[in-house]
Amino acid sequence: METMGRHVISELWGCDFDKLNDMDFIEKTFVNAALKSGAEVREVAFHKFAPQGVSGVVIISESHLTIHSFPEHGYASIDVYTCGDLDPNVAADYIADALHADTRENIEIPRGMGPVQIKQAQAKVL
C-alpha cells in the first residue's frame, strides 16, 4: 500500500530565545518553509502567549505545519505533515536552521499505511 502522507515530528533544542518568542518571525518562517517544500499555503494562524511562547499552524493543501515554542527552555516542538510527493524534511530543516537550533531530533512516520511504523529517529547536533 502506498503511503497517504509523511509526518515529521521534530524536537528542536538550543534555539534562539528571541526567535522563539517572535510571533511574526515564526509565522514568516513557517510560511517560507511551506513554500520552500513546494506546498500551497491555504490558512495561517498563530498565537503569542504571555509572558512568552508562540503556537501556530500553517494549513497547506498537502496537510499542515505546526509549532509550540518554549523560549525559556530554548525548545520548539514542530510537526510537518505532507501528502503526495512533498518531502516534509525540507520544511523541518528550514525551520530548524531559522531558529538556530543547536540540536534537532526528527522522527518520520509514514501515514495511512495501516499500523504505525516509526522510522529510525535522526538526531543532529549542529
Swiss-Prot record:
Enzyme Commission number: 4.1.1.50
Pfam families: AdoMet_dc
Bound cofactor: record note: Binds 1 pyruvoyl group covalently per subunit.
Superkingdom of the organism of origin: Bacteria
Any GO CC annotation of this UniProt entry: cytosol
Catalysed reactions listed for this entry: S-adenosyl-L-methionine + H(+) = S-adenosyl 3-(methylsulfanyl)propylamine + CO2
Pathway(s) served: Amine and polyamine biosynthesis; S-adenosylmethioninamine biosynthesis; S-adenosylmethioninamine from S-adenosyl-L-methionine: step 1/1
Keyword Lyase attributed: yes
Cofactor field: pyruvate
Entry annotation: catalytic residues: S63 (schiff-base intermediate with substrate), H68 (proton acceptor), C83 (proton donor)
Gene3D superfamilies the record matches: 3.30.160.750, S-adenosylmethionine decarboxylase domain (3.30.360.110)
Keywords in alphabetical order: Autocatalytic cleavage, Decarboxylase, Lyase, Polyamine biosynthesis, Pyruvate, S-adenosyl-L-methionine, Schiff base, Spermidine biosynthesis, Zymogen
Any GO MF annotation of the entry: adenosylmethionine decarboxylase activity
Positions carrying Pyruvic acid (Ser): S63
GO biological processes: spermidine biosynthetic process
Posttranslational modification: Is synthesized initially as an inactive proenzyme. Formation of the active enzyme involves a self-maturation process in which the active site pyruvoyl group is generated from an internal serine residue via an autocatalytic post-translational modification. Two non-identical subunits are generated from the proenzyme in this reaction, and the pyruvate is formed at the N-terminus of the alpha chain, which is derived from the carboxyl end of the proenzyme.
Keyword Cell division appears in the UniProt entry: no
Subunit (UniProt): Heterotetramer of two alpha and two beta chains arranged as a dimer of alpha/beta heterodimers.
NCBIfam families: SAM_DCase_Bsu
Function: Catalyzes the decarboxylation of S-adenosylmethionine to S-adenosylmethioninamine (dcAdoMet), the propylamine donor required for the synthesis of the polyamines spermine and spermidine from the diamine putrescine.
Similarity comment: Belongs to the prokaryotic AdoMetDC family. Type 1 subfamily.
Protein name: S-adenosylmethionine decarboxylase proenzyme
Protein source organism: Bacillus velezensis (strain DSM 23117 / BGSC 10A6 / LMG 26770 / FZB42)
